[in-house]
Amino acid sequence: MKKTITFFSAPKPFTNPHIAMIQRNAIKSWTLLEDVEVILLGNESGIAEVAKEFGVKHFPNVKTNESGTPLISSMFEIARENSNSDFLCIINSDMILMDDFVEVARRSRLQCDKFVLLSQRWDYDIASPIDFANGWQSQLRETVRKQNQLHRPAGSDFFLFPKSCY
């Protein structure tokens, strides 16, 4: 079944408990979006287990540089070959997304055929796992707004674009 967006990311190892919790919160938020699929890339510790737990695709054999950093070209190649969606979105594995994300992607397509979508993020240090029960999005939005920590515009945490482009 064709999806709207394929998210793909190369998470850090899940060995540091705080980083693991942040990444798990983010990946879980992606899986709750309507009409998306998720691809996790790399063979870092814990990725295979998290992919299995959340029911997402996992491709461990992404090419890396000498330092072990995944190559963007390899990430894009794997995502293109293994996605079934109109849009691709390379995303940092600490970005929590909410349900308006998919709608913005769909509306962007109505504006023009070729585009790259990115945005400014709100910084928020999450100290515990998110309870993804009903109402989690409105509760998180309110908490984040109270902190009022809008990240400077230079952050590049995701790039969403039509699969047919770039």
Regions found by a protein language model. Name each.
Residues T6-P13, F59-K63, S119-W122, F161-S164:
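Short loop/turn segments at strand-loop or loop-helix junctions that form parts
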Residues N16-P17, E44-V50, D125-S128:
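Short, charged/polar "capping" segments at the starts of alpha-helices
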Residues V36-N43, L117-L118:
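Short, hydrophobic beta-strand segments that form beta-sheet elements in well-ordered domains
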Residues K3-I5, K28-I39, V56:
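Short loop->beta transition adjacent to catalytic acidic/histidine clusters or analogous donor-positioning motifs
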Residues R80, I96-Y166:
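Conserved catalytic core of nucleotide-sugar-dependent glycosyltransferases
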Residues M1-I27:
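N-proximal low-complexity "stem/linker" segments adjacent to membrane-targeting elements
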Residues L40-I91, M98-D99:
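Active-site-proximal specificity loops/subdomain of glycosyltransferases
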